[in-house]
Amino acid sequence: MKVSLCFLWHMHQPHYKDPETGTYILPWVRLHAVKDYVALPRIFRQFPSVRHTFNLVPSLLVQLQDYVENGAEDIYLTLSRKNALDLTRDEEEFLLKNFFSAFPPTMILPQPRYAELFMGQDAARRAIGKPGATGGFGASEYTDLMTLFNLTWFHPMHRDEDDELSRLWRKGRGYTEREKAYVLDRQIEIMSEVIPEYRRLTEKDGGELSSTPLNHPILPLLIDNRAAQDAHPGAVLPKMPFAYPEDALEQLVRGRETFRSLFGSYPSGLWPSEGSISPATIDLAARAGFKWAATDEVLLSKALKKPVLRDAEGVPLEPNWLYSPYRADTPSGTVHLFFRDHHLSDLIGFEYSRWDAVEAVNNFLKNISLIYD
């Protein structure tokens, strides 16, 4: 059975940069870059008959460039570069609190040394500032912790392609400062590959890139915060109305300019921040130059005043109206609208990563088959 499917992968990170210090307070742009952002399009390249759309949020793209071109760092990266012999008590506490920020079943427990440190973190925390206390971490433990935290975030593809990363992953413990530095430097190198990888996706692989307003604002509320009562009648609003449609348009325009500066052309497609749309939002999207937009089925359900009824398997009982494209004619032009299947999206985004790969694929194909039957 041959079916038509649209896959849209949303890549987003909000701004994490502290404007006063110039340092990023969280590491997620860097860590997700080495985990997903390069690996996904490379994996999909192995299946040239399947087309994908990637939504790249401008705030993510700007931060990637900042790391790669300006040498920006986050506080996790800066601390990771420090020799474990020179750590302060506060830094040790920070490491124990934050350097197990990974999904244990797949990113911590499979690596014996990381699992050992994970299990011992509470005792190590109690021993801080108490020389000789049972369970305390020394320089070797902290060096291993910093190295393994950064190493586990690499997608297995990157570890397999890099002999040194592969060796370090197999080594598992007893890391040197030089080995730790290699891991950190390799992260920045992979970050530099993100934008070229997606440029290749559009130029050679037949994929498409879409985008989002510059700083990921909720456009309907930025245009007029009274729009909240359209979705939630009776919602309590500030006494002073808030309406800045000019700013909303500027967010769209600047986002498109950021995109064009990196990829050489403007995006045709828009994934509005958090999927939030309204008639005024669609009009501004058309005015900015977008030709299509995608959002969630719940908005279509509200617009048509029709509930999305599903059977026990999660299959919509009335699929035709949900899986149809829609056309919105606005004073500024036409925008074609597509609405995602919320159930399938949640399976891909939140459930299948916990499943056996074959079982996840079979379940997804079963869902698609049931929908088309």
Features from the language model and the residues they span:
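N-terminal regions that are enriched for targeting/export leaders
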Residues: 1-52, 59-182, 203
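Acidic (Asp/Glu)-rich catalytic clusters
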Residues: 1-2, 43-49, 195-211, 226-228, ...
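Conserved, mostly hydrophobic/aromatic
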Residues: 10, 44, 210-212, 270, ...
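Glycine- and acidic
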Residues: 17-27, 176-181, 230-244, 264-268, ...
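Active-site-adjacent pocket scaffolds in enzyme catalytic domains
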Residues: 31, 273-373
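Short, solvent-exposed turn/loop segments enriched in Gly/Ser/Thr/Pro and often Arg
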Residues: 55-60, 213-216, 269-278, 298
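Acidic, His- and aromatic-enriched active-site or binding-groove loops in soluble protein domains
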Residues: 71-109, 229-249, 286-328
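CE4/NodB-like, metal-dependent polysaccharide N-deacetylase domain
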Residues: 234-274, 366-373
